[in-house]
C-alpha cells in the first residue's frame, strides 16, 4: 500500500475518460472544474464509493443485507485508500423530532447535566423544590372536602416492557389486592396477561380511604407503605374529581405541593412520554385549522362563500350547512356581512360553536326529518374532529388543506412538560438553554458558576458540551439554536453540522470527502471553515473537497482541475498541482480565474428598472425585526447578508409565498408580515430551484422543456409514420403503443440481488433503446427517435437547423451552458446546477411579460466561476426583457453585477433580521457597517 499517495488507475465512472490520478495523502486536496465535468464522479462515485465498498465487503453476508451493498465503481485499481467518510449536502433528517441539539448529541449531554446538577423551582411560588415529609403530604390532602374518596397508589413501574409476572406475584405475597395497569383497575387474584413487547405503567393500590375525622393517621401509614415500596414516590387519587396528585420525598413545593419526579436523563427528553408535553407529545407544534386557510378572503360574507369549507355547500341541503345556519340564526349572525367586520364574539361562535344546547330540526336529502337538542360545533371544531376521525386518505388530505402548524398552546413550543421545565441550571431551564444561539450558549457554559460538589459531578459533561458548541461555532454556525429543527436546515448547514461532529470525533488516518462545504456561507465566515478543514488535515487525515470557492482553493495544499469542459467534453485531468502551479498552468480555466487573468466584469452602468416596487411591510417571521423592504421591479436584485440573517425567511417564506397566495391562490401560509404592496405590478412568480426536474429515468431535458412534443410530432409527420398510421403518441415512452413494454420505456430493468446491491441491466427486448422494433423503423434524416435522444444538445442544433421552432428551444438549453448533455439524459443524472439551468432554459422559451418575478436561492451552488459567468448572462437576458430577478446569494461575482442589493444583518440569529443597507453595489460597498460591503469593496476596486 502506498503511504504518500492515493493512486487511481483507469477511472471510467460516468463521463470519466479512463483517467489516472495521483492524490497526495494527509493533505487538503480540492477537486474543481466546470459543472458536469466529472468532479463528483471522481470524488464521491469513485474514491468514496470504493472506500465504502471495501469496508462493507469486510462484513458478513448477513450484515451486508441490512447495510445494502455498494456496486464496485468502474475503475481498474485504487491504491493507498483509507477508510472513507462522506460529508455531503443531504439534509440531516425530516423527522420533526430531530433538532440541531439531538443531531449533534449536545442535547444528550444537556439531559445528563440537568439530571445531575439541576434544581427544580416551583413555577407558581418560585421557591426551590425540596423533598416533602409525610406530614406535609397529609397536610396537602387535608385541603380536600370531607367525604372525599381517596386512593393511595404506589408507582411500581413506568414505561417498561415485559409481562411483569414476577412483580404481580410479589405484590400478592405482600398482601395487596388491586393494581392499576395502563390506567385500568385490575384484581391481583385474576390472571393478568401483558404484551411483553409493549411499555406498561403499573401502580399498586396501597389503600382506599374516605376523608373524615381521624383519617390522618391511617393516611400517614398508607403513604409510608407506598413510599417504601417505590423508594420515595406515591400518588393520591381523588376519586370524586378523578384527579391525581404526585407526592415525593424527593422534590415538591411546600406551598402548593407542585411535585417533580426523581431527576434522571430520560425525564428531560421530549421523545420520552415522561418528559414530553402531554398535548403535542414532544413535537412543540400541533396541526390545527388555520383561520386564514379557512377564510382566504375576509372581505367576503358567509353567503358569498367566504368560509372555504362551505363554499360548495351554500344554497344546498347538506346537513352540515343546515346545522351551521341554525347556529347562525340562534346567535343572530348576519350571513351577508363581510367576515372582516365580525366581532370577536361572532367569530368565536362560527369557528368554535355554541356553549349551550340548541333545539333544531334537520331534513335529509331523502326527506327524513329529525329533531334534536344539543350544542352545535363551529366550522373549526368540525374540521378538526373530522380530520381526527376519518380513515379515508382522500378526506384526511381535504381536511388537512385547512390546517397549518401552530405552536402548541400547552408548552408554547418548548416540547417538554411543566415538571421538566421547572428544573434549572444557572438560572435557565433546558428549553431556554436550547433556544439560545450556539454562540450565546457557548458563552453561558464557559461562565457557568457551580458549587464545588456540582463542579466535580459536571466537569466532564460540561467539557463535552463546550467542545461540541465550539466546533459548531468554528464552522460558522454560531447563529443557529440547538432547538432548530434539523429538517429546516439548508444543505450547507447540515453538511457543516456533520463536519463539526466529525471534528469532535477526532479520528485520524481517515479519508474525508466533502461536497462544497462553503455553500450558504458568507465570506466573513469562510476563514473559520478553512481553518476547520486544515485542522482535520492536521489530525492526520486526507481531506478531499469538491469546491469552487477561490479562498478555499488558495488555502489548499493541492488542486485537481477536471475538464476541460462538461459532460462529454469533460472527464479528464486538465491540471494538477499546488495553487501557485495552477495559476501558471495555461490549460487550467480555474488557474486563470485564480490568477485574475479571467474575471467576470462589473457592469458599466446599473439598470434604472421600471420605477415600480413590491414592498413587504412589517416582516417579522423568525428573526426579522418588523422590517419594511422594497423590491424594485425590472432590475436584477440581490439579497445578501451573513448566514442566519433572515434572507431565506424574507424572500422564500414571506415574499414568494405571499405572491403565490395572491396570484395562484396557493394554500401555503406566508410568514408573518403586515401587508404587501405593489402586487398588481406582478402577474407571475417563478421559483427556479436546484431540485431535480424529475425523479424517474423517463424525465429528461426535452420532456421538461417541451421540445419532445415537437420532435414526436415531427416523427409522426414522416411518410413511414403516416403510412403506418402512427400519431405522435406512438413516439412517447410514457404510454403504451410505441414503447418497449418489457421495460415500460425505461431502457433498463432492475434485478433484485437480495443481500447484494440491485443491478440495473439494459433491457434484453429493446437493448436499452426504450422503444419497440416497429417504432424504431421510422426515421427522420436516417435517425430513429432513439438516435435523436442520444444526441447532445450541441449536435442536435445542426440536425434541426431547418426547423426553427425546435432549434430555438434547443438553442436556449445550449445558451445556458448545457450543450454537452444529451436530449434524453435521465433527470436523475443531472446535478442541481444543471437542473436549475434546464428550468431557466424552459423559462427563456416563454414570451416575456415584463411583470414576471424570478426567485433563485443561491443559484451558484455547484457552479465553477466559468459557469457563474454563463448564469449571469442568462439572468441578465431575463432582466433585459423587462422581468425581475431576485437572487439570494453570497457569491461576490453575482452580487457585484446586481442592479440593487438588499443587505440583511448585522449578524445571524437574534442579532440579525434588520436591513443594514439597501441600494446599488457601490452604495453597499461604501457602507462601513456592512459585512457584505467590506468584501464587495475589494472586487469593485
Each predicted region: which residue ranges?
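Conserved phosphate-binding elements of NTP-dependent enzyme cores
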Residues: 1-941
Amino acid at each position: 500500500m502506498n503511504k504518500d499517495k492515493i493512486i487511481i488507475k483507469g477511472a471510467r465512472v460516468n463521463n470519466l475518460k479512463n483517467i489516472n490520478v495521483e492524490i497526495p495523502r494527509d493533505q487538503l486536496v480540492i477537486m474543481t472544474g466546470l459543472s458536469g465535468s466529472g468532479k463528483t464522479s471522481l470524488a464521491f462515485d469513485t474514491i468514496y464509493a470504493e472506500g465504502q465498498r471495501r469496508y462493507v465487503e469486510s462484513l458478513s453476508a448477513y450484515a451486508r443485507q441490512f447495510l445494502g451493498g455498494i456496486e464496485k465503481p468502474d475503475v481498474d485499481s485504487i491504491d493507498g485508500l483509507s477508510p472513507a467518510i462522506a460529508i455531503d449536502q443531504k439534509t440531516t433528517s425530516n423527522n420533526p423530532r430531530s433538532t440541531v441539539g439531538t443531531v449533534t448529541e449536545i442535547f444528550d449531554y444537556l439531559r445528563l447535566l440537568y439530571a445531575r446538577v439541576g434544581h427544580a423551582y416551583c413555577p407558581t411560588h418560585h421557591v426551590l423544590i425540596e423533598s416533602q415529609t409525610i406530614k406535609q403530604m397529609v397536610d396537602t390532602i387535608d385541603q380536600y372536602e370531607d367525604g372525599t374518596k381517596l386512593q393511595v397508589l404506589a408507582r411500581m413501574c413506568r414505561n417498561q416492557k415485559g409481562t411483569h409476572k414476577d412483580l404481580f406475584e410479589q405484590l400478592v405475597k405482600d398482601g395487596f389486592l388491586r393494581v392499576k395497569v395502563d390506567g385500568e383497575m385490575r384484581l391481583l387474584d385474576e390472571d393478568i396477561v401483558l404484551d411483553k413487547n409493549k411499555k406498561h405503567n403499573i401502580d399498586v393500590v396501597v389503600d382506599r380511604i374516605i376523608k373524615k375525622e381521624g383519617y390522618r393517621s391511617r393516611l400517614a401509614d398508607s403513604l409510608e407503605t407506598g413510599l417504601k415500596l417505590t423508594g420515595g414516590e406515591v400518588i393520591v387519587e381523588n376519586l370524586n374529581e378523578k384527579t391525581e396528585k404526585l407526592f415525593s420525598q424527593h422534590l415538591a413545593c411546600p406551598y402548593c405541593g407542585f411535585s417533580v419526579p426523581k431527576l434522571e436523563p430520560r425525564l428531560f427528553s421530549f421523545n420520552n412520554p415522561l418528559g414530553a408535553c402531554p398535548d403535542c407529545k414532544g413535537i412543540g407544534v400541533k396541526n390545527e385549522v388555520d383561520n386564514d386557510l379557512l377564510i382566504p378572503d375576509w372581505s367576503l360574507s358567509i353567503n358569498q362563500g367566504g368560509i372555504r369549507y362551505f363554499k360548495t355547500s351554500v344554497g344546498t341541503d347538506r346537513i352540515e350547512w343546515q346545522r351551521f345556519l341554525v347556529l347562525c340564526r340562534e346567535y343572530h349572525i348576519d350571513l351577508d356581512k363581510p367576515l372582516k367586520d365580525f366581532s370577536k364574539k361572532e367569530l368565536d361562535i362560527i369557528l368554535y360553536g355554541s356553549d349551550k344546547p340548541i333545539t333544531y330540526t334537520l331534513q335529509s336529502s331523502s326527506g327524513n326529518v329529525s329533531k334534536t337538542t344539543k350544542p352545535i360545533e363551529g366550522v373549526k371544531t368540525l374540521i378538526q374532529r373530522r380530520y381526527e376521525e376519518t380513515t379515508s386518505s382522500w378526506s384526511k388530505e381535504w381536511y388537512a388543506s385547512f390546517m397549518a402548524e401552530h405552536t402548541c398552546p400547552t408548552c408554547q413550543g418548548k416540547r417538554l412538560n411543566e415538571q421538566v421545565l421547572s428544573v434549572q441550571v444557572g438560572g435557565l431551564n433546558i428549553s431556554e438553554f436550547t433556544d439560545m444561539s450556539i454562540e450565546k450558549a457557548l458563552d453561558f457554559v464557559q461562565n457557568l458558576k457551580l458549587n464545588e460538589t456540582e463542579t466535580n459531578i459536571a466537569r466532564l459533561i460540561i467539557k463535552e458540551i463546550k467542545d461540541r458548541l465550539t466546533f459548531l461555532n468554528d464552522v460558522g454556525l454560531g447563529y443557529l439554536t440547538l432547538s432548530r429543527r434539523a429538517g429546516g436546515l439548508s444543505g450547507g448547514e447540515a453538511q457543516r453540522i456533520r463536519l463539526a461532529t466529525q471534528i469532535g470525533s477526532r479520528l485520524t488516518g481517515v479519508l474525508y470527502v466533502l461536497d462544497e462545504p462553503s455553500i450558504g456561507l458568507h465570506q466573513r465566515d469562510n476563514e473559520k471553515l478553512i481553518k476547520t478543514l486544515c485542522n482535520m488535515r492536521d489530525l492526520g487525515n486526507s481531506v478531499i473537497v469538491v469546491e469552487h470557492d477561490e479562498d478555499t482553493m488558495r488555502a489548499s495544499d493541492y488542486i485537481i482541475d477536471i475538464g476541460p469542459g462538461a459532460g462529454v467534453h469533460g472527464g479528464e485531468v486538465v491540471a494538477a498541482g499546488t495553487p501557485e502551479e495552477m495559476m501558471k498552468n495555461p490549460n487550467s480555466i480555474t488557474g486563470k480565474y485564480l490568477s485574475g487573468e479571467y474575471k467576470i466584469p462589473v457592469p458599466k452602468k446599473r439598470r434604472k428598472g421600471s420605477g415600480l416596487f413590491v414592498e413587504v411591510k412589517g416582516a417579522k417571521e423568525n428573526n426579522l425585526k418588523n422590517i419594511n423592504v422594497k423590491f424594485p421591479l425590472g432590475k436584477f436584485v440581490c439579497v445578501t447578508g451573513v448566514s442566519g440573517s433572515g434572507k431565506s425567511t424574507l424572500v422564500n417564506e414571506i415574499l414568494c409565498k405571499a405572491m403565490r397566495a395572491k396570484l395562484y391562490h396557493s394554500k401555503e401560509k406566508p410568514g408573518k408580515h403586515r401587508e404587501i404592496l405593489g402586487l398588481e405590478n406582478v402577474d407571475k412568480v417563478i421559483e427556479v430551484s436546484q431540485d431535480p426536474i424529475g425523479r424517474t429515468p423517463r424525465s429528461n431535458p426535452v420532456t421538461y422543456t417541451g421540445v419532445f412534443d415537437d420532435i414526436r410530432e415531427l416523427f409522426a409527420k414522416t411518410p413511414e409514420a403516416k403510412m403506418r398510421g402512427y400519431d405522435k403518441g406512438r413516439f412517447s415512452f410514457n404510454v403504451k403503443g410505441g414503447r418497449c413494454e418489457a421495460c415500460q420505456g425505461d431502457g433498463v430493468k432492475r434485478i433484485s440481488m437480495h443481500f447484494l446491491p440491485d443491478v440495473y441491466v439494459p433491457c434484453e427486448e429493446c437493448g436499452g433503446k426504450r422503444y419497440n422494433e416497429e417504432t424504431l423503423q421510422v426515421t427522420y434524416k436516417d435517425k430513429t427517435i432513439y438516435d435523436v435522444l442520444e444526441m447532445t444538445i450541441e449536435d442536435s442544433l445542426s440536425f434541426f437547423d431547418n426547423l426553427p421552432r425546435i432549434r430555438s428551444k434547443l438553442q436556449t438549453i445550449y445558451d445556458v451552458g448545457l450543450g454537452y448533455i444529451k436530449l434524453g439524459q435521465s433527470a436523475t443524472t443531472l446535478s442541481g446546477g444543471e437542473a436549475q439551468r434546464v428550468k431557466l432554459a424552459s423559462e427563456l422559451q416563454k414570451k416575456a411579460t415584463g411583470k414576471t418575478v424570478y426567485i433563485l436561492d443561491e443559484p451558484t451552488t455547484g457552479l465553477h466561476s466559468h459557469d457563474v459567468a454563463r448564469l449571469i448572462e442568462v439572468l441578465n437576458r431575463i432582466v433585459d426583457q423587462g422581468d425581475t430577478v431576485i437572487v439570494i446569494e453570497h457569491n461576490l461575482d453575482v452580487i457585484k453585477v446586481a442592479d440593487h442589493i438588499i443587505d440583511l444583518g448585522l449578524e445571524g440569529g437574534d442579532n440579525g433580521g434588520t436591513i443594514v443597507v439597501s441600494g446599488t453595489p457601490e452604495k453597499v460597498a461604501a457602507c462601513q457597517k456592512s459585512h457584505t460591503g467590506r468584501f464587495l469593496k475589494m472586487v469593485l476596486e
